[in-house]
C-alpha cells in the first residue's frame, strides 16, 4: 500500500524550502555568528598564501593516507594562529595539524575554492575559514595543556609518547589518551634552548630504549601527521609530535617571535578593514568609517590614534591590494584620522571592535560600504608589495578560479 510522504496540510517541497531558509552564510560587510560555524580538524597539505587558500586533509576518515586533501579559503577577516600568536598561511609548515572554524561560501559564484555539493565527514561543505590554529594556539586559547604519561623509546631515534589533554586549571574536561609518534625530527624547547631526542637521552631525562613514566609532566605539543603504516599495518592515523615545549618560558618565547613575524608583515601590507559608512561631501571629499579586522597584535591597533594622518587603498576579498605601488595618489587616499572608538559590547570573532574615521579630499572608488580596504598610520612603511599580492585590476586575479586548486580522483584497487 502506498503512503503519502507529505502531511495532509503540508504542500510538497515545504520542508526543502524550510531547510534552505535555515542555511547560514556570512554576509559581506558583516562579521559572522561564531555559533553558526562548523568546527573540524585537518592536516595542512597545500597553501596558496597569496590568495589566502589551501587544502586540508580532514580527520575522521578510515585512513589518513587515503584521505584526499580538500580545498579551503580564508574569509577576509579569517584569522590564522601559529605558536599561540597571529600568523599568515605562509608561516605554517605543511603537515601541521590545524583546528578550524568554517562556514559555507558567502557567495558560491565567487568562491575561490570548489563548492561542495555532496558533503561527507572528510569533505565538508563548510570550507571558508574564520579561524585556523595549530595545537599550541588551540590549547592556549582554550586554557588546556598536555599531560605526558610515558614514553617508549627504540634505538634512541624514535618512540611513542602517551599523553592526554585537559584543562590547565584542572577539574572536569580530561580528554582521551593518545599515543603519538616522535623521532629525530622532533624538537624540544626548554626556555630559550632547542634540544633533540639525542640531547634528552644524553642528559638521562629519557631512555634510549624502553619505557619510562613521565608522571603527568605538563607541556604544550606541536602536532603534525606524516605517513606511518600501510593497509596491513594500520597505524596510519597516528599523529606525529613535531615540537614539545617543556615549560611556559619556552612557549612564550615561540609566541613572541611569531608575533614579531606577523606584526612586520601587517605593517608592510597594511591593516585590513571593512568600510562601514561613507559620508560624501560636495566636491569628492568624504569621511570614511571603517572597522579594523581582528586577530592582530595589540600594538598594531595602538598605532591608530585620533589626530594623526592615515592612508588607505582598495583591497579584495583575498586581501590583495588593487595595485602594487599603493601610495600613488590615484589609488590611495590620505587624510587625518578624526575619530577612533572601541566597541564596548561583545566583539564578534574576526573583528577588532575598533572603528576609525578618516577624512579625505578625493574618495576612491573602492571605498564603499561593505567593501574591504587596507589602511595604515603614516608612520607605517609604504613599500611596494610583491606582484603576487596585488591584482592590477585583472579579473582572474581579483576572483581566483576554483579550477586551479589541486584535484584528486578516486582510489583504484588493483
Set out the residue ranges of the language-model regions.
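Short, flexible, surface-exposed loop segments at domain boundaries
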Residues: 2-77, 82-414
Amino acid at each position: 500500500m502506498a503512503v503519502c510522504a507529505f502531511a495532509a496540510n503540508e504542500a510538497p517541497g515545504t520542508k526543502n524550502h524550510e531547510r534552505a531558509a535555515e542555511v547560514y552564510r556570512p554576509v559581506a560587510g558583516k562579521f559572522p555568528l561564531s555559533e553558526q560555524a562548523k568546527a573540524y580538524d585537518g592536516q595542512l597539505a597545500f597553501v596558496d598564501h597569496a590568495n589566502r587558500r589551501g587544502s586540508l586533509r580532514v580527520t575522521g576518515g578510515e585512513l589518513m593516507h587515503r584521505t584526499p586533501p580538500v580545498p579551503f579559503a580564508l574569509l577576509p577577516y579569517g584569522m590564522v594562529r601559529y605558536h599561540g600568536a597571529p600568523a599568515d598561511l605562509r608561516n605554517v609548515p605543511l603537515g601541521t595539524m590545524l583546528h578550524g572554524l568554517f562556514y559555507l561560501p558567502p557567495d558560491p559564484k565567487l568562491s575561490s575554492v570548489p563548492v561542495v555539493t555532496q558533503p561527507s565527514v572528510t569533505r565538508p561543505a563548510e570550507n571558508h575559514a574564520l579561524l585556523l590554529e595549530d595545537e599550541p594556539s588551540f590549547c592556549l586559547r582554550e586554557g588546556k595543556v598536555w599531560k605526558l604519561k610515558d614514553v617508549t623509546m627504540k634505538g634512541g631515534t624514535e618512540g611513542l609518547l602517551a599523553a592526554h589533554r585537559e584543562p590547565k586549571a584542572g577539574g572536569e574536561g580530561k580528554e582521551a589518551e593518545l599515543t603519538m609518534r616522535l623521532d629525530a625530527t622532533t624538537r624540544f624547547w626548554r626556555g630559550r634552548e632547542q634540544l633533540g631526542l639525542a640531547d634528552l637521552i644524553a642528559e638521562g631525562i629519557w631512555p634510549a630504549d624502553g619505557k619510562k613514566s613521565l608522571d603527568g609532566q605538563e607541556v604544550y605539543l606541536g602536532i603534525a601527521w606524516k605517513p606511518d603504516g600501510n593497509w596491513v599495518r594500520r597505524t596510519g592515523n597516528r599523529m606525529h609530535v613535531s615540537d614539545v615545549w617543556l615549560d611556559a618560558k619556552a612557549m612564550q618565547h615561540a609566541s613572541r617571535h611569531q608575533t614579531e613575524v606577523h606584526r612586520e608583515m601587517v605593517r608592510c601590507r597594511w591593516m585590513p578593514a571593512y568600510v562601514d559608512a561613507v559620508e560624501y561631501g560636495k566636491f569628492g571629499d568624504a569621511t570614511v568609517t571603517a572597522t579594523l579586522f581582528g586577530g592582530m597584535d595589540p600594538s598594531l591597533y595602538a598605532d591608530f590614534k585620533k589626530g594623526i594622518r592615515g592612508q588607505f587603498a582598495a583591497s579584495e576579498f583575498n586581501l590583495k591590494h588593487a595595485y602594487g605601488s599603493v601610495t600613488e595618489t590615484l589609488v590611495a587616499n590620505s587624510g587625518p584620522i578624526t575619530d577612533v572608538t572601541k566597541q564596548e559590547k561583545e566583539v564578534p570573532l574576526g573583528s577588532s571592535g575598533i572603528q576609525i574615521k578618516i577624512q579625505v579630499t578625493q574618495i576612491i572608488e573602492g571605498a564603499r560600504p561593505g567593501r574591504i580596504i587596507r589602511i595604515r598610520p603614516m608612520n607605517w612603511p609604504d613599500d611596494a608589495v610583491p606582484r603576487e599580492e596585488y591584482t592590477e585590476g585583472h579579473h582572474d586575479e581579483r576572483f581566483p578560479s576554483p579550477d586551479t586548486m589541486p584535484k584528486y580522483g578516486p582510489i583504484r584497487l588493483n
